């Protein structure tokens, strides 16, 4: 759509960006699905960090909306969708805020590890609003072993794969985008 006064396009995303967002979202969804048989081991956190570093906050935020909406279509509506619509953008904003301050993969691995470690707590807060404080507390305490696994797997995954994936996607984005 053209702006009548300036003659410039007023679209939010170009066609190339929409295709990119679709491909990145599909990669997230399929990556999560492939690893779903292993409790709390996932590549979604890694990919959101890499997408933010390579493609920027704006595109990564749109990917998070598409990914979460796709997850709802797969798994149905529940209280978890509130957390997904909040936490993935928060991870993107944190990554974006620290992208110039953190140069090595260790800093990003710590962010990913802490994110995984606190993931269940955020769900417990939302569950408390719907089912009561005691339910939320039990939900969180029973999930602590899974949160520890989630944090450790996020740390290791980002530590090992962030740099090569960032390098690869940066090179591909220069060639195709």
For every predicted segment, state its role:
Residues 51-57, 70-75:
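Interfacial segments of multi-pass membrane proteins
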Residues 53-56, 94-102, 163-170:
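Structural signal for the C-terminal ends of transmembrane alpha-helices
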Residues 46-49, 72, 92, 120, ...:
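Hydrophobic transmembrane alpha-helices of multi-pass small-molecule transporters
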Residues 81, 104-177:
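Membrane-embedded alpha-helical hairpins and interfacial helices in multi-pass inner-membrane proteins
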Residues 29-41, 66-99, 131:
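Interfacial aromatic-anchored transmembrane helix boundaries in multi-pass membrane proteins
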Residues 2-50, 58-62:
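Hydrophobic transmembrane alpha-helices
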Residues 2-8, 17-24, 63, 83-128:
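Short helix-perturbing small/polar motifs within transmembrane alpha-helices
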């Amino acid at each position: 759509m053209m702006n009548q006064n300036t003659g410039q396009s007023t679209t939010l995303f170009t066609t190339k960006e929409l295709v990119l967002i679709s491909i990145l979202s599909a990669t997230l969804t399929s990556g999560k699905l492939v690893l779903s048989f292993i409790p709390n081991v996932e590549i979604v956190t890694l990919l959101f960090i890499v997408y933010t570093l390579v493609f920027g906050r704006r595109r990564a935020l749109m990917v998070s909306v598409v990914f979460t909406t796709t997850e709802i279509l797969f798994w149905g509506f529940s209280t978890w969708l509130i957390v997904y619509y909040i936490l993935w953008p928060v991870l993107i904003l944190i990554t974006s805020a620290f992208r110039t301050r953190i140069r090595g993969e260790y800093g990003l691995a710590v962010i990913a590890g802490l994110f995984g470690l606190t993931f269940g707590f955020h769900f417990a807060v939302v569950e408390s609003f719907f089912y009561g404080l005691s339910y939320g507390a039990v939900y969180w305490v029973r999930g602590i072993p899974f949160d520890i696994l989630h944090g450790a797997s996020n740390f290791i995954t980002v530590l090992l794969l962030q740099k090569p994936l960032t390098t690869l996607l940066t090179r591909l984005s220069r060639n195709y985008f």
